[in-house]
Amino acid sequence: MTQVTVKELALVVDTPVERLLQQMREAGLSHTSAEQVVTDNEKQALLAHLKGSHGVKLEEPRKITLQRKTTTTLRVAGSKTISVEVRKKKTYVKRSPDELEAEKQRELEEQRAAEEAAVRQKAGEEARRRAAEQEAQRQAEAAAAAAVAAKEPESALGVAPEPVAAPPASEERKREEPRRVDKEKVRNVDDERRERKNAQHRPSIKDKAPAARAVVRSVDEDGEGFGRRGGRGGKSKLKKRNQHGFQNPTGPVVREVTIGETITVAELAQQMSVKAAEVIKFMFKMGTPVTINQVLDQETAQLLAEELGHKVKLVSENALEEQLAESLKFEGEAEARAPVVTVMGHVDHGKTSLLDYIRRTKVATGEAGGITQHIGAYHVETDRGMITFLDTPGHAAFTAMRARGAKATDIVILVVAADDGVMPQTEEAIQHAKAAGVPIVVAVNKIDKPEADPDRVKNDLAARDVIPEEWGGDTQFVHVSAKAGTGIDELLEAVLLQAEVLELKATPSAPGRGVVIESRLDKGRGPVATVLVQNGTLRQGDVVLAGVNFGRVRAMLDENGQPLKEAGPSIPVEILGLDSTPDAGDELTVVTDEKKAREVALFRQGKFREVKLARQHSAKLENIFETMGQDEKKTLNIVLKADVRGSLEALQGALSELGNEEVQVRVVGGGVGGITESDANLALASNAVLFGFNVRADAGARKIVEQEGLDLRYYNVIYDIIEDVKKALSGMLGSEVRENILGVAEVRDVFRSPKFGAIAGCMVLEGNVHRNRPIRVLRDDVVIFEGELESLRRFKDDVSEVRAGMECGIGVKSYNDVKVGDKIEVYEKVQVARSL
């Protein structure tokens, strides 16, 4: 017999050890620890206790059979002994309590019958007494009425006496009340007698138990739960079963579904109180396959919930953002601030050179390729006040960077070369300025060149709704030369005049607020962000929040690298201390609590991730049917690292636009800073090319590149990287086969040759006819045969080529149906490399 401990028994019955010990103590067992042994008898005792505590009555045996064995030995002849076993069996039958119960029932019936007879006798006497009283009262009233009628004189004149008024209804109800009570008593007595009679004739519990188990009734049928009647003497006793009853709703239940900007399928199903499988099935019917953890955007979830008949409540999940906005108070006296001026225009029109002359520096010569690839932010002290300049790139790839420049600025200086006129990026800069509602000052540059034509610039800009002041418009035109310095003072005066009209003000005493112009990852200092302070004052040590990033300002530097303690409105600074490089264009805000900044940053990260996933999935679903049945595109994978965030965005946008329906570019990884070992591993895993834009690879990355033979390329001009990617994509396209027609000959006569069959006597009309080249036979300009030129002769001599204007004999391989007037076209197939 195997013995088990209390702990093992608890594992078997799936209950905590403490609870099992408590139940054993209640059962009278002496176990106190989990390591004590439990015998089979103790298990039976515990089981009997648990059954009794849960209302299960253990039925006592009505019949007990005892067996007794005795063995004796008998000696027989031959000194042999025989074992004799005597078995005795005795059965004890317990007397059934039914007879005692029946006797008790008879006594109770006789007692109840006597009580009922007494009640009926008493009720009858009470009814007779009340009837006698009512009869006497009625006779007295009739006598009184007759006496009154005899005294009236009208009776002698034959006037009919007035009828006796009927007793009021209330009195009638009073007289009827005793009779009604008596009837109710008699009815109750009869009901009790009938119930006892039915109870005596009911089957016993044992006979009824199987039928009761077979019948299942719901809560709605008897109102008290599931049960069956039982008990001694047929008494009605209702035993409830611990079973839940559910009543189906008579109509669809309409619920209010709260939907944020994104919601998963499981959360939406839970709010609608339906299974997630039903939601997935419904989405399949709508033509959108989803999974249970799929993130749905707000519009899709709203459409789905409304289709299923529920009310939709759209909520904005910006409670933290609103709370943050309320906590920011910009109190104080507003003061005039310096204007923020953005210099925009087409590439190579002289934007940076113009700023160089104003700042008396040489920035343009230091730019790679002589073009600006970052947003430069500078503030300049002039005789008439301070001006902050933002220099934006002019290349087509930097559209987003120019848009950010227009968004953060007060005035736009549109630089147009007098010798070049309005170009595509010039038009784009005009559109950005108008979209941001920013006034434009046009600087017509390179006015000192001989081929300069400023009037053409005016006409081109006027055609694009930029009207000069002298023509009745509101745009100032200034002729300047960035090299000679002509018109620079007039340009600054025009800018400051425009700033006075705008009445630019800020509150220096308020907490700092600005916009991120640029960001990069410095190897020695970490994430560095170029920030333009727009309002308030930014101080060293402030806790700042920029998009999904936050941190404490550890240091501030101006554009010359000099440290600053604080920066007021319209001052561009570089700040150190953020946890990562923020995106250019993010709004930077000073907050009071670092905990609140971290909470808002994490909330924005989660929100951005969910929205991005929802958009990616919707884009995949939109393209699923378009790409069905098409060959898979060839993809050029690129890992791209750049020095600043703006250049990274510009390159990603420019590279993603390259390609066609056969090849495409996919930037599998991108970031700011040098090329690290993890970037090299990513390129190795994804079979990608490593591109470094103004950055270099560290020692670990170079080691992996050399060992694995990865393709690592460095660039410092955006034109070069785009051209190289175009060449790589063109190589992935492969080559195509083209046909070049070498010559055309017309059949003038047909000869028969025993060796070659039909020989066509031809005149070469165009080009040259070559032997052993593919040909086509055309009749009425319709191709009737394609084959190979087998024999080419001139004056019975085999030749390899016949030029135009000469006669020749042509034998076509496996073709004899040549007729006069046919044309024989000789061609060749060449493979040509394709390009984008």
Curated annotation (Swiss-Prot):
| Chain positions covered by the region annotation Disordered | 114-252
For this protein, the record's Pfam families field holds: EF-G_D2, GTP_EFTU, GTP_EFTU_D2, IF-2, IF2_assoc, IF2_N
Q: Where is the composition biased (Basic residues)?
A: 229-243
Bias type Basic and acidic residues, positions:
114-138, 170-210
Q: Where in the cell does this protein reside? A: Cytoplasm
**Residue spans of biased composition, Low complexity class:** 139-150, 159-169
> Region G5: start and end of each range?
481-483
Region G2: which residues?
370-374
Query: Which segments carry the region annotation G3?
Result: 391-394
Which PROSITE patterns has this protein been placed in?
Answer: G_TR_2, IF2
The alphabetized UniProt keywords are:
Cytoplasm, GTP-binding, Initiation factor, Nucleotide-binding, Protein biosynthesis
Q: Where is this region: G4?
A: 445-448
Residue ranges of domain tr-type G in the record: 336-505
Give the Gene3D superfamilies listed for this entry. Answer: P-loop containing nucleotide triphosphate hydrolases, Putative DNA-binding domain, N-terminal subdomain of bacterial translation initiation factor IF2, Translation factors, Translation initiation factor IF- 2, domain 3
* UniProt-recorded Gene Ontology molecular function terms: GTP binding; GTPase activity; guanosine tetraphosphate binding; translation initiation factor activity
Give the matching InterPro entries. DNA-bd_dom_put_sf, EF-G-like_DII, EFTu-like_2, IF2_assoc_dom_bac, IF2_II, IF2_N, P-loop_NTPase, Small_GTP-bd
Q: Provide the residue positions that the database annotates as binding GTP.
A: 345-352, 391-395, 445-448
Q: Among its keywords, does the record have Cell inner membrane?
A: no
Q: What does this protein do?
A: One of the essential components for the initiation of protein synthesis. Protects formylmethionyl-tRNA from spontaneous hydrolysis and promotes its binding to the 30S ribosomal subunits. Also involved in the hydrolysis of GTP during the formation of the 70S ribosomal complex.
Q: Which family does the UniProt entry place this protein in?
A: Belongs to the TRAFAC class translation factor GTPase superfamily. Classic translation factor GTPase family. IF-2 subfamily.
Q: Which HAMAP family match?
A: IF_2_B (MF_00100_B)
* Record protein name field: Translation initiation factor IF-2
> What is the species listed in this Swiss-Prot or TrEMBL entry?
Azotobacter vinelandii (strain DJ / ATCC BAA-1303)
The gene it comes from is: infB
